[in-house]
Amino acid sequence: MSAFIYNNSNNNNSMRLCVMGDGGVGKTSITIQFISNHFVNCYDPTIEDLYRKQCLIDDQVYMLDILDTAGQDELNAIRNHWIKSCEGFILVYSVTSRSSFDQIQSFLDQIKFLKSEKVPIIMIANKSDLDDERQVTYQEGENFANRFGMSFMEVSAKYKLNIDEVFNQIAQHCVKRRCDHIYINKSIRNKNSIFKKFNQKLNNTFHSICKMI
């Protein structure tokens, strides 16, 4: 069950994030550790869960709506519906599973296919505390993330290593993207206004010349 009841809201201070990755990489453990500050080791396979938490980002309070997605292929349709509505994405693999790392590319492709523009994405490697079972090096993860312009961290849901940092960073990226959009839209409106005034002045000048002739 979800940790918080979800209420649909158009509040500008509400932000939708999506946690994606193969089954068994610890998406739910990561999310619950962030939401409730405790580690869940045994958990039923997730279908779709939505969690909520208030966070202070750049001196402003935001309500984070965090979708913990299913890893199963048969639930792609549900996942696709939610991807379209999310602002930022956390892609998760396990350092103990080479196959989960290889699957990150497919999740990236899915986001690019469903989103019409570039969105903030951070890639994280969970279970960094299980170094003896490691199949993916830190350098491999960092190189892959750099190739696709993503931030990268290794985390441990069990020991809450870098968990808060991950969610704070993706939320900050989303806030910056919102601000950039506002600035761009304002610049476009200003340019359109200047262009309109210039055309009006040009037309007035033209009419004045015509009257003189």
Curated annotation (Swiss-Prot):
InterPro entries xrefs: P-loop_NTPase (IPR027417), Small_GTP-bd (IPR005225), Small_GTPase (IPR001806), Small_GTPase_Ras-type (IPR020849)
Binding site for GTP: 21-28, 68-72, 126-129
Motif (Effector region): 43-51
Any one cellular-component term (Gene Ontology): plasma membrane
Residue span(s) of the pro-peptide: 211-213
GO biological process: signal transduction
Keyword Ligase carried by entry: no
Keyword Transmembrane belongs to the record: no
Lipid-substituted positions (S-geranylgeranyl cysteine): 210
One GO MF term attached to the UniProt entry: G protein activity
Gene3D superfamilies tied to this protein: P-loop containing nucleotide triphosphate hydrolases
SUPFAM superfamilies: P-loop containing nucleoside triphosphate hydrolases (SSF52540)
SMART domains listed in its UniProt record: RAB, RAS, RHO
Localisation per UniProt entry: Cell membrane
EC number: 3.6.5.2
Stretches that traverse the bilayer: none
Catalytic activity field: GTP + H2O = GDP + phosphate + H(+)
Bilayer topology: Lipid-anchor
Cysteine methyl ester PTM sites in chain numbering: 210
Keyword annotations: Cell membrane, GTP-binding, Hydrolase, Lipoprotein, Membrane, Methylation, Nucleotide-binding, Prenylation
Main function: Ras proteins bind GDP/GTP and possess intrinsic GTPase activity.
NCBIfam families: small_GTP (TIGR00231)
Family per record: Belongs to the small GTPase superfamily. Ras family.
Protein name per Swiss-Prot or TrEMBL: Ras-like protein rasU
Organism: Dictyostelium discoideum
Gene this protein is translated from: rasU
